[in-house]
Amino acid sequence: MEKYADLLKGVDGDLMNPKRFMIVTLLYTLGPMSVRELRRALGVTWGDLDSNVRRLVEKGYVKLWKGLGSGPRVLEVKIGLTELGEAEYERLVAKLRELLNSLERRSA
């Protein structure tokens, strides 16, 4: 079993957090969006989103900026992945795929 644990060594535990993983997954697949859109897509409270986004900003994985909005709002806060965030997400997904492939080979 140690072999499987070794596959995830070096992976940032902050990205393994389910909500942070979903935030980064949505930004990776859909691209930058407004914080309001992200909150709706995740179905989380503002407080929950804020604490998780703050942690991702601290790690340098996402960035926030004000941009033109659609509808009645002229400006809204946008969120997107940084280059570091994209790289770390890709590394995490590769490690998870490697782990799943290893487990599938073992069960076959």
Task: List the predicted regions and their residue ranges.
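Short alpha-helix boundary/capping elements
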Residues: 31-32, 53, 61
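N-terminal helix-turn-helix DNA-binding core of bacterial DNA-binding proteins
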Residues: 7-48, 69-70, 76
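Basic, amphipathic "hinge/linker" alpha-helix immediately C-terminal to the N-terminal HTH DNA-binding motif
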Residues: 69-91
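Short amphipathic alpha-helical interaction segments
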Residues: 44-58
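Amphipathic alpha-helical dimerization/coiled-coil segments
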Residues: 2-6, 26, 83-108
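A short, conserved structural fragment
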Residues: 60-67
